[in-house]
A protein has these predicted regions:
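A short, Lys/Arg-rich alpha-helix, primarily the initiator
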Residues: 1-19
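Short, charged recognition helix plus adjacent turn
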Residues: 12, 37, 55, 65-70
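Recognition helix of helix-turn-helix/homeodomain-like DNA-binding domains
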Residues: 29-44
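DNA major-groove recognition helix of helix-turn-helix/homeodomain DNA-binding modules
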Residues: 48-63
Length: 70
């Protein structure tokens, strides 16, 4: 599992969610600035934040982590 793949896939999924940065931030309890950093592949979320993102946005954690191709 490579950080680059995780960052790229998470960024892609956040952009495709149809939600604004502020909406995502409110849903998972982080600042909009943190979501911006995830969207721009500058930073990875902590594990608990990653879990919240996956649950709130119905994301496939296995895909984001590079364990599956789609």
């Amino acid at each position: 599992m490579e950080n680059t793949i995780i960052k790229e896939r998470l960024s892609e999924e956040l952009k495709n969610s149809g939600l604004t940065t502020i909406e995502i931030a409110k849903r998972i309890g982080v600042s909009p600035e943190m979501i911006t950093q995830y969207r721009t592949t500058k930073k990875l979320p902590k594990l608990d934040t990653f879990a919240k993102l996956c649950m709130e946005l119905d994301l496939d954690a296995n895909y984001i982590l590079g364990l599956t191709k789609n």
